[in-house]
């Protein structure tokens, strides 16, 4: 009798675990901007690599679905999600009130502070007095673009938007920009620590404004995909709890990227 009860309990447990993901599609198409190392980029072989990619693959594994990564310009990600060309966004997408009017988000993936970079020795600071008359590059469709347009542009700062982050760095290095505003970690790991960024440094402290930058980044999802949102949250919670998240993060960062 005890053996029968144990066997039944195990069967019920397995059935429950399987049914929790039963409503999910077999394949989940995840959109990402591959110009944002170390979160999302492509290696020499054209494979998707980065912390966002590792997180997405691990969550899909736990959800028992196949991940298909779709490269996209950043500002096309939310329109593609709403048009059902992709099923989710994992691309350093900050959770903001404005975006939550359009789409749903998972729980926080990691923190996301923003910061200016400029040539080493430059006196530029993230203030109106310092930036007036200067050319500042931002990623099109990003929270940094929204912030710069609404707080700096009308005060005489030339805010220049680019389709991808690599173009921002390229024009900064070529001297066509005086500074660039982007995610702090992406700037540090994807530019300042690379050969192309050797003559540049952070300019001033982090730019903080919850209205524009939110409380961190998350998986972007359609509002009517409640099952998929719940599945991502469940998988994320598991990998945070069992230490997998910290192990993956250490591959890229020497600090607490999750934040408070």
Swiss-Prot record:
Residues 1-22 form the signal peptide. It is found in: Periplasm. GO terms for biological process: amino acid import across plasma membrane; cellular response to nitrogen starvation; cellular response to starvation; cellular response to zinc ion; L-lysine transport; ornithine transport. Belongs to the bacterial solute-binding protein 3 family. It comes from the Bacteria. Keywords: Amino-acid transport, Disulfide bond, Periplasm, Signal, Transport. L-ornithine binds at residues 33, 91-92, 94, 99, 143, 183. GO terms for cellular component: ATP-binding cassette (ABC) transporter complex, substrate-binding subunit-containing; membrane; outer membrane-bounded periplasmic space. L-lysine binds at residues 33, 92, 94, 99, 143. The keyword Ion transport does not apply. Disulfide bonds join 60-67. This is Lysine/arginine/ornithine-binding periplasmic protein. L-arginine binds at residues 33, 91-92, 94, 99, 143, 183. InterPro entries: Lys_Arg_Orn-bd, SBP_3_CS, Solute-binding_3/MltF_N. One of its GO terms (molecular function) is amino acid binding. Part of the ABC transporter complex HisPMQ-ArgT involved in lysine/arginine/ornithine transport. Binds lysine, arginine and ornithine. Stimulates ATPase activity of HisP.
């Amino acid at each position: 009798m005890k053996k029968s009860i144990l066997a039944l309990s195990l069967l019920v447990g397995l059935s429950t675990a399987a049914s929790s993901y039963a409503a999910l599609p077999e394949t989940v198409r995840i959109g990402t901007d591959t110009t944002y190392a170390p979160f999302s980029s492509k290696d020499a072989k054209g494979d998707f690599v980065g912390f966002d990619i590792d997180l997405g693959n691990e969550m899909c594994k736990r959800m028992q679905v196949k991940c298909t990564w779709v490269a996209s310009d950043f500002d096309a990600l939310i329109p593609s999600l709403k048009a059902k060309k992709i099923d989710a966004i994992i691309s350093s997408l900050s959770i903001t009130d404005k975006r939550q009017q359009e789409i749903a988000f998972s729980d926080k993936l990691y923190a996301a502070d923003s910061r200016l970079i400029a040539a080493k020795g430059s006196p530029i600071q993230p203030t109106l007095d310092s930036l007036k008359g200067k050319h500042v590059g931002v990623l099109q469709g990003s929270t940094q673009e929204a912030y710069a347009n609404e707080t700096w542009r009308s005060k005489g700062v030339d805010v220049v938007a680019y389709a991808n982050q690599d173009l921002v760095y390229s024009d900064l290095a070529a001297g066509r920009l005086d500074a660039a505003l982007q995610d702090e970690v992406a700037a540090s790991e994807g530019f300042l620590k690379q050969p192309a960024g050797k003559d540049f440094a952070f300019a001033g402290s982090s730019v903080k404004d919850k209205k524009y930058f939110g409380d961190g980044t998350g998986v972007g999802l359609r509002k009517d995909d409640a099952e998929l949102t719940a599945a991502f949250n469940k998988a994320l919670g598991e990998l945070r709890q069992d230490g997998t998240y910290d192990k993956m993060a250490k591959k890229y960062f020497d600090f607490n990227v999750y934040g408070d």
